[in-house]
UniProtKB/Swiss-Prot annotation:
This is Thiol peroxidase. InterPro entries: Redoxin (IPR013740), Thioredoxin-like_sf (IPR036249), Thioredoxin_domain (IPR013766), TPX (IPR002065), Tpx_CS (IPR018219), Tpx_Peroxidase_subfamily (IPR050455). It comes from Corynebacterium glutamicum (strain ATCC 13032 / DSM 20300 / JCM 1318 / BCRC 11384 / CCUG 27702 / LMG 3730 / NBRC 12168 / NCIMB 10025 / NRRL B-2784 / 534). SUPFAM superfamilies: Thioredoxin-like. The active site is at C60 (cysteine sulfenic acid (-soh) intermediate). The keyword Chaperone does not apply. It comes from the Bacteria.
Length: 165
């Protein structure tokens, strides 16, 4: 189990993030129209997986906004914003904020969190996804990972985006 912190208190995750060079585990998530989104849908494209507990928190919302801004200039890259929020909440947030360059998807009925070792095991956020980023190359290999040390802080956007090159 990996360790992260929530408001200064250590909490464990359900496992470890995949290692750089590993194949990303196949996944199925749910988009804002309740349609299935599969890792197979992105074959041949680079992926940035912006993973967070809930879009209804300030830091999570900020991460979606910042990756949305960055995604506008990325080539052959899809940015997935992933939480266990219901698809309706993700859609409402993105509509209200004018978010159009990222793909919001929900892991609410998926093993995505377990498969990537990022389900929070403790803290008041138990069961939600830990704030993390996974960058995947066009061949499905993990190029970068970050488990953010303090859930209430933002990920390292620059490092994640640099891993695309």
């Amino acid at each position: 189990m990996a360790k992260t912190h929530f408001q200064g208190n250590e909490t464990a995750t359900s496992g470890e993030l995949p290692q750089v060079g590993d194949n990303l585990a196949e996944f199925n998530l749910v988009n804002t129209e309740l349609g299935e989104v599969s890792s197979k849908d992105f074959q041949g494209r680079k992926l940035v997986l912006n993973i967070f507990p809930s879009v209804d928190t300030g830091v999570c919302a900020t991460s979606v906004r910042k990756f949305n801004e960055a995604a506008a200039s990325l080539e052959n890259t899809t940015v997935l914003c992933i939480s266990k929020d219901l698809p309706f909440a993700l859609g409402r947030f993105c509509s209200a904020e004018g978010i159009e360059n990222v793909t919001p998807v929900s892991a609410f009925r998926s093993t995505f969190g377990e498969d990537n070792g990022i389900v929070l095991e403790g803290s008041p956020l138990k069961g939600l996804l830990a704030r993390s980023v996974i960058v995947v190359d066009e061949n499905g290999k993990v190029a970068y990972t970050q488990l953010v040390d303090e859930i209430s802080t933002e990920p390292d956007y620059d490092a994640a985006l640099a891993a695309l090159n």
